[in-house]
Amino acid sequence: MMTTLRRRLPDIVQYSVLSLAAFLSIFPFIWMVIGTTNTTSQIIRGKVTFGTALFDNIASFFAQVDVPLVFWNSVKIALVGTALTLLVSSLAGYGFEMFRSKLRERVYTVILLTLMVPFAALMIPLFMLMGQAGLLNTHIAIMLPMIASAFIIFYFRQASKAFPTELRDAAKVDGLKEWQIFFYIYVPVMRSTYAAAFVIVFMLNWNNYLWPLIVLQSNDTKTITLVVSSLASAYSPEYGTVMIGTILATLPTLLVFFAMQRQFVQGMLGSVK
């Protein structure tokens, strides 16, 4: 029996640590769900059991927020921005891997170096550019800085190394143009890579807070993230209402991740199917 226990001890320790880590990760979400059913005073007192104020908190949130509008703003920015980022960045990654040029590696290195520049250093120049272009207080101004993402370009170039070059060569022999090879062959073959990139970029766009806070000024252009933040920073915040908004803001990213979890893992592992 002692021998069996010694053999299983590493597994017991491993699963205990993983269980603790999982609990610590999910506890804030559980506490947030419980908080939606309690009043502000109960939450401040630290109540960790379910209450009876759920419908009051929901009614309060919908009374203060134009939920369809802010959700539409968030969905539009997230989906359109993600689609544009995947298109531009995958084209760039494909080009850097497939085409030979003396300047290729130099340009690629410059793009990667931009990853070392903090976004805070770019905010003022970007804000001035958007102002000169007349794009302040528009959703286009939120999407543009993300379209050519250095990380996603790097990700697609690395994934493109696993793309079978025989397919490209055979397509060229059959007379296909480069854009046809990209859209009709490369994209379907690399769908797991696209799925993983979609999850990453969608979450970044959906949770984007600082840049929209600076650019979006009118209430009819704001996203769910900004609205929930404004409720939380009010002079006398209603925490139950804030938690309702936080859950509503969190659900889309969770749904996207769980719906595409298998493809996400395949894409991150470099799977090409």
From Swiss-Prot:
Keywords of the record: Cell inner membrane, Cell membrane, Membrane, Sugar transport, Transmembrane, Transmembrane helix, Transport
One GO term of the biological process aspect: transmembrane transport
Protein localization: Cell inner membrane
Induction summary: By lactose and various galactosides, and subject to catabolite repression by glucose, galactose and succinate. In strain AR50 the expression of the lac operon is constitutive.
Residue span(s) of domain ABC transmembrane type-1: 71-260
Tagged with keyword Cell membrane: yes
Transmembrane segments: 15-35, 77-97, 110-130, 134-154, 182-204, 240-260
Gene Ontology cellular-component annotations: plasma membrane
Annotated membrane topology: Multi-pass membrane protein
Recorded superkingdom: Bacteria
Keyword Transmembrane among UniProt keywords: yes
Pfam families from the UniProt entry: BPD_transp_1
InterPro entries xref list: MetI-like (IPR000515), MetI-like_sf (IPR035906)
Main location: membrane
Purpose of the protein: Part of the binding-protein-dependent transport system for lactose. Probably responsible for the translocation of the substrate across the membrane.
Family: Belongs to the binding-protein-dependent transport system permease family. MalFG subfamily.
Full protein name: Lactose transport system permease protein LacG
Organism: Rhizobium radiobacter (Agrobacterium tumefaciens)
Encoding gene, per UniProt annotation: lacG
